[in-house]
């Protein structure tokens, strides 16, 4: 909201307060002033000039040689390139020595051999935004009214000796989306009175009701509609003071009639619309819901297709305007308009908001209806508009209005005690001081033994509960005046929970392993909701009652589908190597009508290269063992590695030979594996591996304690063993048998090679293990190690039918 400092002074006496002081005070009262703009931008030396003579430049077709009276002893010659310069006009002239925006100084000059003692200015050259300049002057110089005084300060006439405050309003303060609302706020801050606009309306004997009737079919969407006739208007420019105020408010002047409706909008916050009465096509206004597919061409020359929940203003058959959003081109006020029908209405904010969003069309009017307007100003606004049209457009305001009034404005009384105000704010404000504040706010009230019963005016729909009144007192008292106190009472040092600590360990380890954290949607589509679940669940996923789209209609049962979407998105954009993880919740359905069970899971996905080609080694492609290694490292960090085993598994969407369940103490807590080739094809990815597991179950396991020991004084001995076994043999089971057979001396077993090449018999594979033997108390002999190693060989031969590879 842009607020002209000089315009504001018409409603509240603040001449003793500078614009910057006012901005600081408003900000401290709870409404942020985002900036204060000085309109003149350092311009000086610009006066009103009267063009006495104007002829073509002898050496240039597009230049004019003008003799201009600027209020000094002698007129001056100025060369001007504007197409609309002409004899007899009064124009803004920057004299020699004048300063324009950007510290541009005007000097004597010669243009094509002719002397020029100044510059005739366009509004843009005086610092006014070109978007706010009326079309009449957009491509030329500005022309003052004929009664402008020659030599007078042009900036004063243009109202540029002004400052504009930009208010950053929150949605609940729609009452300040107009000058009167801001005036009430400022008056409350300074304890001053609000001067309401004087309405000098002279009506004719003819009645508005003789020309138009109004009926409302959609009473819920439009509880109040008022219309008034103004005849015999003469379309032209609005008065200079009105144009400059509108430009200061960020609105481009158009014509006197249209400018008056916009002026009332900015003054009262009441949107108005002016119809060309002679183009209505009937003598009735009917407000109804649109017919599905009904069309209307709006003022922006766009044809709009309406839906059945959109509210329209019609002539009984044809739509004339989209209620609260924008008028129609068919009944637009033009230069030929003679008779005007003014509309002032109260439209339901929800209806306007939905219509505006559907049509992709926002306006100053729709913004105010959406947030809520003061319905008690609707009649006053239309009367003031009619008075201004009679005065500045030469119109004749007909007697009375025609209205359809189904609006019931209920009085709101909100109560609060002085004790509560002081308790919440931490202040010691007396009841009489609070009463003064409510008086300054223009809130009528009664006080009974320290309890205030406040009648809230309709202009403040944000005041509904006692806490709102506490806030009002706090704002006017000044948040900067509230005493500063330190928290009292026993202080306890905060700390992370066990789960929070472990989650941080998970993130730190996975990011160290080269995975990036992703945060995906908790909502998914129906067909993806049950994909890649850790545990099968026959119940239907939890669905939203009113989803925004089918793609986001179900609560997820797995993190994997959303991560795969992210991988597919990246691969499609030539980012072929992706490693992502997510810590997030899944939502397990429970009994019907009950909330789902929320369980935290960890999922990851890797595709492409695990190690890019570098000078120190060859590139490494992601495979099952790369991802399994990441998980084993994670389990080791969490202290549960000895409790985790892996079992071959077949899962929907996963590769049947490269998928395993993750088992913790006999319970399946997750899975790891490669996507099924068909799934990879659908996602347009290759060689993609995923895992998902329940963090709740991992964190709930008893973590192994960490022990520290001295550096060994005695050497260890390593023996390698490569055995040939059937392809069905599980390396993990063999590793466990080796560890048991090796006894106390065998400290570590590592699988370092798997071979299934051409030299192996069909159905066979080679597994190679490295075994480390060690005794912390002495040096082992070769015989002791050989004895333990032979036990290992015997165990794997008996258990798995293994043969030493030769």
UniProtKB/Swiss-Prot annotation:
It is found in: Cytoplasm. Its main location: cytoplasm. InterPro entries: aa-tRNA-synth_II/BPL/LPL, B3/B4_tRNA-bd, DNA-bd_dom_put_sf, Fdx_antiC-bd, Fdx_antiC-bd_sf, NA-bd_OB-fold, Phe-tRNA-ligase_IIc_bsu, Phe-tRNA-ligase_IIc_bsu_bact. GO terms for cellular component: phenylalanine-tRNA ligase complex. Mg(2+) binds at residues 462, 468, 471-472. Keywords: Aminoacyl-tRNA synthetase, ATP-binding, Cytoplasm, Ligase, Magnesium, Metal-binding, Nucleotide-binding, Protein biosynthesis, RNA-binding, tRNA-binding. Its cofactor is Mg(2+). Its EC number is 6.1.1.20. Binds 2 magnesium ions per tetramer. Residues 712-805 form the FDX-ACB domain. Tetramer of two alpha and two beta subunits. Belongs to the phenylalanyl-tRNA synthetase beta subunit family. Type 1 subfamily. This is Phenylalanine--tRNA ligase beta subunit. The gene is pheT.
